[in-house]
Amino acid sequence: MNSLIKENMRMMVVMEGSVNGYQFKCTGEGDGNPYMGTQTMRIKVVEGGPLPFAFDILATSFMYGSKTFIKHTKGIPDFFKQSFPEGFTWERVTRYEDGGVFTVMQDTSLEDGCLVYHAKVTGVNFPSNGAVMQKKTKGWEPNTEMLYPADGGLRGYSQMALNVDGGGYLSCSFETTYRSKKTVENFKMPGFHFVDHRLERLEESDKEMFVVQHEHAVAKFCDLPSKLGRL
């Protein structure tokens, strides 16, 4: 247990960027229990609102990127909590099946006992008649991220699905590289493992100008038994 990371932690976030050339900025604040893997965040669009695209494509960069709030089961070293007080960064490319591409660069730091996130995002090639630009998405299904050590950090891959108005899904693939600001020689790296995520929107108002979302995340090994004794 990292003494700098308490059982209840506050967080603050500033996100800015563009989607199909449209500029915007969001801020958020929240709290949660990093050791139980639960967190709640309240997010406001402070520039460029109401957004002309679905807020859902931003949602995963607020909380699916809030990696300090993951419960790690026994035997899995916590790469993210070990990174403090220096913190960590991550870069992600999300490719949607309709051709849209969403890239994120995020920095996580610890300031006066509060986790502070700065995110730069860029979305391109989202079809004007697609679910994202028509704002016809209805939230993310739960998913599992696959993680393993790579290039001195962690590499994450996952397939995700957005619910769409009228039934059906818009699927996408995530590829994320996580890097600690601390040299990896100073802590224990995890091996191959998975993280289950459930990201839910609890509240929204004013045409998605204000959103409250909650996430529960747990790191684990494969649940299936191995004949070779592997985890």
Curated annotation (Swiss-Prot):
**Annotated positions of the (E)-2,3-didehydrotyrosine modification:** 64
Entry PTM: Contains a chromophore consisting of modified amino acid residues. The chromophore is formed by autocatalytic backbone condensation between Xaa-N and Gly-(N+2), oxidation of Tyr-(N+1) to didehydrotyrosine, and formation of a double bond to the alpha-amino nitrogen of residue Xaa-N. Maturation of the chromophore requires nothing other than molecular oxygen.
* Domain of life according to the entry: Eukaryota
Keyword Cytoplasm tagged: no
The protein's use is: Fluorescent proteins have become a useful and ubiquitous tool for making chimeric proteins, where they function as a fluorescent protein tag. Typically they tolerate N- and C-terminal fusion to a broad variety of proteins. They have been expressed in most known cell types and are used as a noninvasive fluorescent marker in living cells and organisms. They enable a wide range of applications where they have functioned as a cell lineage tracer, reporter of gene expression, or as a measure of protein-protein interactions.
Q: What does this chain do?
A: Pigment protein.
What family is this protein classified in?
Answer: Belongs to the GFP family.
Quaternary context = Monomer.
User: What name does this protein carry?
Assistant: Red fluorescent protein eqFP611
Native source species = Entacmaea quadricolor
